């Protein structure tokens, strides 16, 4: 390959020679000499470094060999490459691309064309690496990163916005169906199901309704839930549903979906928010096991705790070292008219007791301060005040004036006795330790929601319509699949290491991998800027990528970028304006 610019032919007459073949004169450089013993003389070893300009015998068109043997010569850059950065960050992309290939995610997008597949996966990679989901910043990301679209074509923010709004419900459902169809439906797995919500100020999102927000800002909300396979450590499905629908009532619809997917031998690990008699009965009907957390102050379990209080809290046989907690198991009916008995696992933690006692005392102190300020005034106090205090009101001029209050000592003392205790209810027989370890394994799914909001840029979705909202949630789920794999592989590798380095977290690892860069040479080809460091080798090794493999993959991307298509031009000089409307 010869570059499309001219340089002066080197004047080193001892090593520069010309070789004319047909109508072209090639410039050759003698880089070494080899002695031939039989003939007793040296043979020059030459390589072509360019071809002479027919109109000027002092100038030539160089090739990559010229850069190799004359590195000090400054070559002009080409105008063609101005649309792409001369420094391409390739490290994090290598890991994401390998996970995409290992999962064969493109195969689950069977109805999509190559452009659509590439653009969807590019948006997922963009949200992981940049921790952002704003369409108007995607071209900035693609300017200095490889992409998965054919020809490494970079699309404008307007195209991205249109693309997100055109992702149809059939395409989203087809992906989830295919993603779950390929699994072993007879394998025993436990699924963690959890939900969160996003505050919404957009007027055109159909699912935005007033409900029970995690963080109340006085705005409608949209609910969002994820089901996570705890054994294989992979997200299985996601749901978005109206904000007025309470979590406890949504669970039965999820169970029906898993029945439809054909899962035969599964159990659910659930937070206390999903505990209800109807949900328990429905899981029994589906023959699905369950593991549900219950607070020690729960009305149906606190008597069990008080009955067993003092019988296991210091017994070493009951100690669970992993969580510095004592636990015991007993069998009992969940409801008086239950046909089967459940297994109740009772736990006590000194640290939890201290924290809960402090929290309760502080809450009582704040309530008393509030009531003291309201004395002699008309006051409508929340219901929780009457739980802990007897309030005395006097009627004056038709108004209820707060006169005084008195602690309900028996109620407070009972709750103090329950501080530090909690319970887990399971449908299948297991030890207290097994039940706790199984429940605690759902921490990964909780981290998924943290990732969704903090590390994928989805604290704010920046949409104003239902179609774009659904498209961005779908992209976020694809990104969660990939990022979850990054998290589990790093955690697995870190557990094997004697030292626990702080660069083995997902944000730190991605930042370190972003330092692996391809630098564009004057001829348009890309080369690694420097050797891969020991830290980067450790991170890449977590994903089965060794140094040689990383170099080969990076250089292959560099060759593809040499022939990359021109970026799409933005028709509107002001770009696409997105509103920060869904938090």
Q: Which residue stretches match the model-derived regions?
A:
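Secondary-structure capping and boundary motifs in well-ordered enzyme cores
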Residues: 117-118, 130, 152, 156, ...
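Secondary-structure transition/capping motifs at alpha-helix termini
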Residues: 37, 145-152, 170, 184-186, ...
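Acidic, metal-ligating active-site segments
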Residues: 32, 205-230
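Catalytic or ion-translocation cores adjacent to nucleophile or general acid/base/metal-coordination motifs
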Residues: 240, 245-256, 260-263, 274-318, ...
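Dynamic "connector" segments at or just before major functional cores
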Residues: 1-192, 196-202, 225-237, 242-244, ...
């Amino acid at each position: 390959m010869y570059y499309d610019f001219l340089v002066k032919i080197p004047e080193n007459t001892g090593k520069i020679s010309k070789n004319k073949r047909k109508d072209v004169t090639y410039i050759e450089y003698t880089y070494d000499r080899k002695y031939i013993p039989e003939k007793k003389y040296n043979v020059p070893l030459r390589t072509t470094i360019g071809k002479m300009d027919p109109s000027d015998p002092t100038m030539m068109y160089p090739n990559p060999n010229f850069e190799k043997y004359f590195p000090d010569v400054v070559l002009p850059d080409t105008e063609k490459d101005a649309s792409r950065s001369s420094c391409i960050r390739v490290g994090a992309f290598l890991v994401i691309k390998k996970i995409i290939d290992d999962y064969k995610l493109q195969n689950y997008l069977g109805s999509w064309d190559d452009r659509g597949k590439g653009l969807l996966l590019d948006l997922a990679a963009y949200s992981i690496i940049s921790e952002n989901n704003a369409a108007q910043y995607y071209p900035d990301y693609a300017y200095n990163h490889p992409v998965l679209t054919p020809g490494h074509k970079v699309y404008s923010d307007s195209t991205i916005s249109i693309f997100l709004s055109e992702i149809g419900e059939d395409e989203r459902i087809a992906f989830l169906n295919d993603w779950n169809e390929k699994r072993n439906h007879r394998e025993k797995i436990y699924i963690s199901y959890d939900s969160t919500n996003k505050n919404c100020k957009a007027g055109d999102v159909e699912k935005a309704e007033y409900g029970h927000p995690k963080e109340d800002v006085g705005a409608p909300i949209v609910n969002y839930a994820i089901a996570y396979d705890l054994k294989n450590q992979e997200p299985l499905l996601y749901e978005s549903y109206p904000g007025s629908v309470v979590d406890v009532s949504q669970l039965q619809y999820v169970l029906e979906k898993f029945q439809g997917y054909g899962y035969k031998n599964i159990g659910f690990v659930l937070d206390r928010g999903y505990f209800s008699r109807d949900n328990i009965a429905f899981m029994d009907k589906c023959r699905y096991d369950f593991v549900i957390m219950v607070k020690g102050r729960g009305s149906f379990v606190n008597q069990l705790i008080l009955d067993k209080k003092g019988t296991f809290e210091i017994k070493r046989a009951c100690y669970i070292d992993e969580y510095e907690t004592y636990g015991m198991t007993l069998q009992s009916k969940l409801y008086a008219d239950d046909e089967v008995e459940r297994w109740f696992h009772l736990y006590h933690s000194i640290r939890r007791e201290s924290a809960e006692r402090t929290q309760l005392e502080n809450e009582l102190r704040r309530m008393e301060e509030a009531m003291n300020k309201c004395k002699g005034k008309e006051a409508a106090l929340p219901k929780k005040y009457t739980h802990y205090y007897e309030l005395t009101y006097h009627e004056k001029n038709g108004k209820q004036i707060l006169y005084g209050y008195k602690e309900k000592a028996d109620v407070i003392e009972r709750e103090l006795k329950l501080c530090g205790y909690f319970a887990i209810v399971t449908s299948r027989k297991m030890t207290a330790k097994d039940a706790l370890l199984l429940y605690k394994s759902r921490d990964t799914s909780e981290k998924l929601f943290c990732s969704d909001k903090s590390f994928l840029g989805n604290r704010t979705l920046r949409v104003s319509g239902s179609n774009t909202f659904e498209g961005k949630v779908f992209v976020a789920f694809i990104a969660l699949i990939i990022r979850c794999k990054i998290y589990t592989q790093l955690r697995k590798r870190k557990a094997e290491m004697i030292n626990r380095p702080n660069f083995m977290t997902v944000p730190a690892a991605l930042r370190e991998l972003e330092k692996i860069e391809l630098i564009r040479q004057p001829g348009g080809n890309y080369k690694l800027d420097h050797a891969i460091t020991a830290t980067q080798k450790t991170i890449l090794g977590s994903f089965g990528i060794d140094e040689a493999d990383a170099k080969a993959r990076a250089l292959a991307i560099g060759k593809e970028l040499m022939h990359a298509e021109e970026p799409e031009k933005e028709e509107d000089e002001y770009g696409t304006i997105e509103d920060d409307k869904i938090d």
